[in-house]
Amino acid sequence: PVSNLKMATDTLLEKPMTEAERTDFIRGIRTQTDKLDFLFQALVKTSRLETGVIQLDKKVCNLYDTVAQAMSGIVYAAEKKEISVSVNCPEKLMLSHDSKWTAEALFNLLDNAVKYTSAGGKISVSVVQWEMYVEIKVADNGKGISESNQAAIFRRFYREEEVHSEPGVGIGLYLAREIITRQGGYIKVVSAPGNGSAFSIMLPVK
């Protein structure tokens, strides 16, 4: 983002252009500053978790509210791409978890699903209680991920070559896994190129 910002501002300063061209460059600068802000916020959150500045606070609360909080962050982006989003979650499922940070982790999975699902695609969110865990699954019919890359996607700053055109910095899945792992849970993925992806947050019942 920084190099793109420098290039855009240099062009604005040095090259004569029409008002329409100038407006396009300013929009581009805004996009890059948004990316920079996203990266900064993600790095701050990750650093605070890793250094213990932020301690997760698990309390028994309604998981439906946590899911709703995460969903609210992707509604506009999904509508913009005409992606249909369905949710199947019990309204009275009480679970010991950190609602704020679990919503952050779920939002990161949802955000990825929106980014890598083509316009007009589908995303489904489902919540199921098993004997030992509660599963929050985010499934899409997007690009999919090869089996050889499925472990790597949780590394910090990792991004697959074919998705570099999409916005992102490669830290969302890493942060999501950190949040869930610190609550005694884990994240699993089932995916194949061309067949979409299903990410499941598994949180312990006790």
Where are these regions (language model features)?
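Short alpha-helical segment of the dimerization/phosphotransfer core of two-component systems
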Residues: 31-36
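Conserved micro-motifs of the catalytic ATP-binding
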Residues: 51-56, 94-98
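Conserved catalytic submotifs in the C-terminal HATPase_c
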Residues: 57-61, 79, 84-94
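A conserved beta-strand-to-alpha-helix junction within the catalytic ATP-binding
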Residues: 57-72, 86, 128
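Short beta-strand/loop element within the Bergerat-fold HATPase_c
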Residues: 120-132
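Short conserved segment of the HATPase_c
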Residues: 145-157
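Conserved glycine-rich
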Residues: 185-186
